[in-house]
Amino acid sequence: MAFRRRTKSYPLFSQEFVIHNHADIGFCLVLCVLIGLMFEVTAKTAFLFILPQYNISVPTADSETVHYHYGPKDLVTILFYIFITIILHAVVQEYILDKISKRLHLSKVKHSKFNESGQLVVFHFTSVIWCFYVVVTEGYLTNPRSLWEDYPHVHLPFQVKFFYLCQLAYWLHALPELYFQKVRKEEIPRQLQYICLYLVHIAGAYLLNLSRLGLILLLLQYSTEFLFHTARLFYFADENNEKLFSAWAAVFGVTRLFILTLAVLAIGFGLARMENQAFDPEKGNFNTLFCRLCVLLLVCAAQAWLMWRFIHSQLRHWREYWNEQSAKRRVPATPRLPARLIKRESGYHENGVVKAENGTSPRTKKLKSP
């Protein structure tokens, strides 16, 4: 892992060299961009990597506010923050997770899952706080009608656009991390599924100008995922601690219901009642019946798939639990061997002395002297 003291050197730009030094390589690239800010010739190009592009001034009653829309230059900004995320990933891994896992003495399988949950706990916790702050300051919680009113939401505030760029950067960085972290082949399909699922939903909300609805749905989803991975960390620390899993199971079903309700309310009813329903990609308007059906189908299919996996996992867990209980009941108790009766011819022994049947010691026969 990056930033560690290494005792073994690898050939330059070899596979092992890149794996063990990928965070250092990313840090060097980020440093080059930051150095570019110091010179007037390269400052404009450096700002292209660091700051969101496509800003416009929107006049208001008091003054002007700066808003943003998306474009191809966003890919450059996302690339820069992919390297930032790789560096932060390595810092969390080395200075937090590795120190904790050494004390727990986990197996290889549990160690891999512990690292995965540890990284996602940090990410989900940060994203929940950030997303909640954006939603509250922009007034999306107090005014639910703003999720579909004035669509298309082409002009985004700075914090909304920056949030989406960082989200895309994080989930894109998770793809090469599968290679850098040497994830087991059995785990790669499962992780690819939820990485691609997040990328499709976040990019879809960003490109289809459904950013307000996307923020609310991400807030709900990330809150549930944070609870799940926190429960898994506590389980790895103490296998008897499963109380948080019960809380997560209750929250999971409620979250699926809320996500489906909000999606149907905003897309199926809110956007359907808007007057402007013409397909106009140049103006960012995708409010047509076909687009609404596709978005609703995607959201409903994703929630149904997550719910099916949840039910399947719960049934398997209960089946294993009842099998263990039935196995314990089938184990026969070890029979006690009957006490072995000792046949005594006359009297019995007590403390090494022969006793008569009436409890008295037999008198020793005196020998007559000749």
UniProtKB/Swiss-Prot annotation:
Extracellular side: 44-75, 141-159, 210-214, 272-287
Entry's localization field: Membrane
Pfam name, any one: TRAM_LAG1_CLN8
TLC domain segment(s): 112-321
UniProt membrane topology term: Multi-pass membrane protein
Cytoplasmic side: 1-22, 97-119, 181-191, 236-250, 309-370
GO cellular component: endoplasmic reticulum membrane
Main location: membrane
PROSITE patterns (alphabetical): TLC (PS50922)
Similarity-based family: Belongs to the TRAM family.
Protein name as catalogued: Translocating chain-associated membrane protein 2
Name of the gene this protein is made from: TRAM2
